[in-house]
Amino acid sequence: MIKLLFTYICTYTYKLYALYHMDYACVCMYKYKGIVTLQVCLFYIKLRVFLSNFTFSSSILALKNPNNSLIKIMAILPENSSNLDLTISVPGFSSSPLSDEGSGGGRDQLRLDMNRLPSSEDGDDEEFSHDDGSAPPRKKLRLTREQSRLLEDSFRQNHTLNPKQKEVLAKHLMLRPRQIEVWFQNRRARSKLKQTEMECEYLKRWFGSLTEENHRLHREVEELRAMKVGPTTVNSASSLTMCPRCERVTPAASPSRAVVPVPAKKTFPPQERDR
């Protein structure tokens, strides 16, 4: 009887609070097995010291569509606690904690606690790795400085390890052989990528030097062609003279190379040519 009276007081308190703020819609509440449920609600308000003085720390909004199946917010009030648990149900997730127990945990349930800040366990974006399909996911491997130093020294000595070396190194570093193998694979991939980047940079510089050398050779070829063709055309008009005897063109600078006139061809009369 006391519990029922307490539930009714809570219900009417919520209604009065909703009517006091006319901007908000009416909030319907009902009692079922000690659980007070908000069927239509937009924002969930954290309540402080609820059992002592019924004071509210913020406001409550109602959804416009009460049959909305995308979001259902349940406020669970334990008997001996002043904190509220928030359960948000979305498609693919269960809306009640009892359904998961009855179905054997076939669907997952997303639970949020408004009384504390989300921790790293609630939303961890770190990478996970699987040894096989049945193994649970585990977080990305975090190495200490000493472990990293020993692994780097081992990698400098040998880029690949046999199973026996993996066992010895894993035992020394307190790791699993599979983790040692994965670390060496990643290290070889990083080393190969670094070497490829260095080779690409070297080839770029070499290509630039060859391009400059090619341009320089082209300029030299053009200069040589200009030097060979230019003076020849100038001297050909100034150093040639006309010989009045043979009417031939001879160079004036070299008289010893004068062309000897060729005698005219002797012609015969028609009678002698017939003989």
UniProtKB/Swiss-Prot annotation:
Keywords (A to Z) from UniProt:
DNA-binding, Homeobox, Nucleus, Transcription, Transcription regulation
Main localization (coarse): nucleus
| DNA-binding region boundaries | 136-195
Q: Where in the cell is it found?
A: Nucleus
Listed under GO biological process in this entry are: response to salt stress
Q: Which GO terms describe its molecular function?
A: DNA-binding transcription factor activity; DNA-binding transcription factor activity, RNA polymerase II-specific; sequence-specific DNA binding
Residue ranges, annotated region (Leucine-zipper): 203-224
Q: Highest taxon of the source?
A: Eukaryota
Q: Which GO terms describe its cellular component?
A: nucleus
User: Where is the segment annotated Disordered?
Assistant: 95-143, 252-275
Record SMART domains: HALZ (SM00340), HOX (SM00389)
- Per the similarity annotation, which family is this? Belongs to the HD-ZIP homeobox family. Class II subfamily.
Purpose? Probable transcription factor.
- PANTHER family tied to this protein: HOMEOBOX-LEUCINE ZIPPER PROTEIN ATHB-17 (PTHR45714:SF8), HOMEOBOX-LEUCINE ZIPPER PROTEIN HAT14 (PTHR45714)
> By what name is this protein known?
Homeobox-leucine zipper protein ATHB-17
Taxonomic classification, please? Eukaryota, Viridiplantae, Streptophyta, Embryophyta, Tracheophyta
